[in-house]
Amino acid sequence: MTTPTPAPAPTTSASQVPLSPTTGESMNVIARRGRVGLWFIIVMSVSGTIALIISYSYLWSLNVNGGWAPPGAKLTANQTNNTIGKLRGDFAPEWPFWAIMGVVIVATAFMWWGYRSVRTKGNHGALVAGSTLALIFSIAALVAQWIQISTFPFGPTNGAYASAVLLLCASNIFNLLIVIFVLIGIVNRSRKGLINKLVWYQAQATSYWMTWVVIAFLMGVIVTTFMVESPNTDPSIFGGFKQQ
């Protein structure tokens, strides 16, 4: 009578995906959930950004009551309306929008370099360096965005253009704050070796999010560069509300 041969014990390969220390699930499963959550956040941000772009374009094209932007609309003689105040001020300079976007692009490039290095080559040092540089440039972009807002030649009540531009810049600040918050976590986790060649989904998600932030900046830069003076120089005039 032959004795059954026992099954060989499972071996642990160096390339085996580790399990989560909290749930015991494969890190691939955790990564898949993380990607789904990331796309939900991106869809939410896309919806808000597109709404701002549409609002900007709508107000720019209508120029109702000549209230699009400083120094006010050029009204014809038969459209004189004393209830319309002539706004004073200037449009925002265009180059700071492009400069700030350039800084964000550099930060995103560093993050992608670090992520690709650790995923394909297992270069842990490149991820630490890339995420740290991305964090520094993101903070620089946030400071530059704040300086731009504080030096605008108009306030939020100086026409529809002023309000629309300020909202776009506020959206940029919100996106940059998320980027900085996430990058702080990436830097800390990469320094501790928690992000490596086997577990890289957090660096990937951060790279995806930063790519979307660049696209959001680009959409804002396009409208603030090529849609400045309203094409409607003969705007409609509507009555104003008066307190009885």
Predicted features by range, described:
Residues T2-Q244:
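...captures the hydrophobic TM-helix bundle architecture rather than a specific catalytic motif
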